[in-house]
Amino acid sequence: MKWLVLLGLVAFSECIVKIPLRRLKTMRNVVSGKNMLNNFLKEHAYSLSQISFRGSNLTTHPLRNIKDLVYMGNITIGTPPQEFQVVFDTASSDLWVPSDFCTSPACSTHVRFRHLQSSTFRLTNKTFRITYGSGRMKGVVVHDTVRIGNLVSTDQPFGLSIEEYGFEGRIYDGVLGLNYPNISFSGAIPIFDKLKNQRAISEPVFAFYLSKDEREGSVVMFGGVDHRYYEGELNWVPLIQAGDWSVHMDRISIERKIIACSDGCKALVDTGTSDIVGPRRLVNNIHRLIGAIPRGSEHYVPCSEVNTLPSIVFTINGINYPVPGRAYILKDDRGRCYTTFQENRVSSSTETWYLGDVFLRLYFSVFDRGNDRIGLARAV
């Protein structure tokens, strides 16, 4: 019996492809010294989700944690393959990287796709535009072979940027969207849907484990769930509607007192967001309740008080998900402790929260396209 269990584990591990993530120096500290943090956060921390213009074959892909700002992983495009660092983003649907014919300064500081060097490249005459918080890009839809670990999507449509503005401080080369196809700004079929249609994955599921480790441990996995990354049972939450990774949140509380989302609200589970983002008035109230003092674009607390701060509890589908002070307070390179609650600068008619990497480092997340639901469990 022991041999059967051992053989099963060996077979299971052979189907897993892990793509590591590592944590680098925080861009928050680098940029804040140049009074550029507000624009940088608008462009990169949570605006990826705010587009204004249109089991058996388990694959795990390692990601790198850029000092609590963003998690990146490597993919390759073309034949022979060219490597790019991309953000795996559950709030957008498209894959795009810089093109070799982009002359914008932002493109010159990143890896650009050299289409003439790929024998499988195919151009289309379709263009697209996308606008972020304070940046914008223009691109063209093309086709080529894209690889995520050992997953291969042939003739995959994706975007090549031909103009980029406001992205000069970006660490990553591009974005790989994992949301539903209906919110694609380019109209191209997302890579996850293409892999599913090509039967490259056994189940229409992907999952994220975001490690606290600066150098390794974080993974995105496709086609199933590796149960070694979480403890207990997965708590499944139905989506508000098929077509977006957003769920109904019951409330947000501190010490059993409701402080936000009092009548229920919308929560987007967003791997492309570094912080927890919500309406300005409610975020300011949280800062007041924990005694955070504004300084520039940040709110700070004495580092000596971090372990005494109350947990902020997010209740989703009747299950409490506490986020302790040591998770929502981070330390910058000057040794100062700042909060990771940020106000949403884009107005919304309904109360909406973005549960970004601060939340997802605590809770393993599963995105189930087959059943239009999200699973959450305590990460190991």
UniProtKB/Swiss-Prot annotation:
Subcellular location: Secreted, Extracellular space
GO molecular-function terms, A-Z: aspartic-type endopeptidase activity
Pfam families: A1_Propeptide, Asp
Tissue note: Trophoblast and placental tissue. Produced specifically in the invasive binucleate cells of the placenta. Becomes detectable in maternal serum soon after implantation.
EC number: 3.4.23.-
Record family assignment: Belongs to the peptidase A1 family.
Protein's name in the database: Pregnancy-associated glycoprotein 1
Organism expressing this protein natively: Bos taurus
